[in-house]
Amino acid sequence: MEKFIILSTVLAASFAYDKICIGYQTNNSTETVNTLSEQNVPVTQVEELVHRGIDPILCGTELGSPLVLDDCSLEGLILGNPKCDLYLNGREWSYIVERPKEMEGVCYPGSIENQEELRSLFSSIKKYERVKMFDFTKWNVTYTGTSKACNNTSNQGSFYRSMRWLTLKSGQFPVQTDEYKNTRDSDIVFTWAIHHPPTSDEQVKLYKNPDTLSSVTTVEINRSFKPNIGPRPLVRGQQGRMDYYWAVLKPGQTVKIQTNGNLIAPEYGHLITGKSHGRILKNNLPMGQCVTECQLNEGVMNTSKPFQNTSKHYIGKCPKYIPSGSLKLAIGLRNVPQVQDRGLFGAIAGFIEGGWPGLVAGWYGFQHQNAEGTGIAADRDSTQRAIDNMQNKLNNVIDKMNKQFEVVNHEFSEVESRINMINSKIDDQITDIWAYNAELLVLLENQKTLDEHDANVRNLHDRVRRVLRENAIDTGDGCFEILHKCDNNCMDTIRNGTYNHKEYEEESKIERQKVNGVKLEENSTYKILSIYSSVASSLVLLLMIIGGFIFGCQNGNVRCTFCI
């Protein structure tokens, strides 16, 4: 009985040991993240990587202001539609905006050869200047042909500003030949057309010659054209058609034209220079007084986030497009609430069972209990290293996704609808690959982050254990019971790593011997009890066997024969 009393007394005294615990911060955040191995892991803090807001306006970029074509299409500007006179004197732009409505483009019905390539060429330049190429006053033809299909802003018959409709003069249309040399230091884009009358009578009426031949040649092209005469459906009041062509005349090159009818001859060309973003947007957004690094068809996006889910088509340095509406990067700790019913030191588990809501000055820290009371303090060094690491992780994700990739919205004609379909599929597949890479990267980083936080707490725990050495007992739950009296100054030295274990070595050794002695007494007591129990059990069993044997003999059920 004395042994049990001594054991109880010493164990009770052990609960009075000064104690220091290692743990981490927890808060009331409801944020969760996904990792490679877990879904919806609670964390104290996250960074949303997908930007969703947008300002519905048009802004300039570092290359300048956009060219907003309110009433004209790009084709109308290039051909010189008479209702696009506003753009005759040349323009400069960073990108082009067309409105999603019927625009003034090709006024006399017909089609432009390689139209999408012409649009792409013009959208990629920065500015143009109109240059005179041919002077038709020297030609023995009429060069003032007009059409009601190409009315000007006064609703009077007119024609393209970049070309001349050549017709007979004095009842004749002799063969006309002329040439132009590009003496400028930039390319010149020029256009021409071939007229296809609806009837032979109109052919003769306009050009005298029933069978004509026109040619346009340079060192790179050699084109000859004959009209296809015949009636066609009425479009813009016309049964005739025009096929439109274009070419690029490089510096030093010469273009030669020859015709005896049906040629819509080039008069002005466009001297093109510089490079723009090479994009054509189509929207009704208003123009703002602003400059942006990221312009989408839907508006302006100003953000430092690496991803957006608004549009895959953009201009400038925009976040990568991913279909996902949210992608969260963990930049805090695993958010495990403290066990509430155990009190501050009832069984603090630190990094094992839960965090501390009272740890507000850092991510990792200490709680202690001694004769002076209890206290909590953050470990600023490990916290700062972790915060710096989180910022590096965020920058790492941004850098890995910073390789600019633009999905260019190629424009193909109806004839090339299959190419358009293939292009769209390729765009979608590339976008899916980017989205998969982004999600996988974030899952990996989240996994590493949570693992690193666990390691940081363990490292802090190991640091304290190395400082205390044999002067404390590791209770296995993130806490240490100190085998000597440790006031607040002593606790500070443990936290900052200046603790001198030799100063308390003797006191701790004596206390540890007491603890070990109690354990020995306890073990001896248990051994004696075990022996007593075994002997008593054996005696009882032996008595039961003997009693059964005697009972059997008395009843005649057992017969004993002794042989000598």
Swiss-Prot record:
PTM text: Palmitoylated.
Compartments reported by the entry: Virion membrane; Host apical cell membrane
Q: What Pfam families does its record include?
A: Hemagglutinin
Q: Which GO terms describe its molecular function?
A: host cell surface receptor binding
Instruction: Enumerate the Gene Ontology biological process terms.
Output: clathrin-dependent endocytosis of virus by host cell; fusion of virus membrane with host endosome membrane; fusion of virus membrane with host plasma membrane; viral budding from plasma membrane; virion attachment to host cell
For the keyword tRNA-binding, the answer is no
For the keyword RNA-binding, the answer is no
Which residue positions carry a glycan here?
Answer: N27, N28, N140, N151, N152, N222, N302, N309, N496, N523
Which cysteines link up through disulfide bonds? C21-C479, C59-C290, C72-C84, C107-C150, C294-C318, C486-C490
Membrane-crossing residue ranges in chain numbering: 531-551
Q: Which residues form a coiled coil?
A: none
* Covalent lipid adducts (S-palmitoyl cysteine), residues: C553, C560, C563
Question: What topology in the membrane does the UniProt record assign?
Answer: Single-pass type I membrane protein
Query: What keywords would UniProt list here?
Result: Clathrin- and caveolin-independent endocytosis of virus by host, Clathrin-mediated endocytosis of virus by host, Disulfide bond, Fusion of virus membrane with host endosomal membrane, Fusion of virus membrane with host membrane, Glycoprotein, Hemagglutinin, Host cell membrane, Host membrane, Host-virus interaction, Lipoprotein, Membrane, Palmitate, Signal, Transmembrane, Transmembrane helix, Viral attachment to host cell, Viral envelope protein, Viral penetration into host cytoplasm, Virion, Virus endocytosis by host, Virus entry into host cell
Q: Where is this site: Cleavage?
A: R342, G343
Q: Which InterPro entries match?
A: Capsid_hemagglutn, Hemagglutn_HA1_a/b_dom_sf, Hemagglutn_influenz_A, Hemagglutn_influenz_A/B
The positions making up the signal sequence are: 1-16
Q: Provide the membrane-side ranges marked Cytoplasmic in the record.
A: 552-564
The remark listed among the other comments is: Major glycoprotein, comprises over 80% of the envelope proteins present in virus particle. The extent of infection into host organism is determined by HA. Influenza viruses bud from the apical surface of polarized epithelial cells (e.g. bronchial epithelial cells) into lumen of lungs and are therefore usually pneumotropic. The reason is that HA is cleaved by tryptase clara which is restricted to lungs. However, HAs of H5 and H7 pantropic avian viruses subtypes can be cleaved by furin and subtilisin-type enzymes, allowing the virus to grow in other organs than lungs.
What is the role of this chain?
Binds to sialic acid-containing receptors on the cell surface, bringing about the attachment of the virus particle to the cell. This attachment induces virion internalization of about two third of the virus particles through clathrin-dependent endocytosis and about one third through a clathrin- and caveolin-independent pathway. Plays a major role in the determination of host range restriction and virulence. Class I viral fusion protein.
- Assembly and interactions? Homotrimer of disulfide-linked HA1-HA2.
Q: Which HAMAP family match?
A: INFV_HEMA
Task: Give the family this protein belongs to, as stated in its UniProt record.
Answer: Belongs to the influenza viruses hemagglutinin family.
From the Swiss-Prot or TrEMBL record, give the protein name: Hemagglutinin
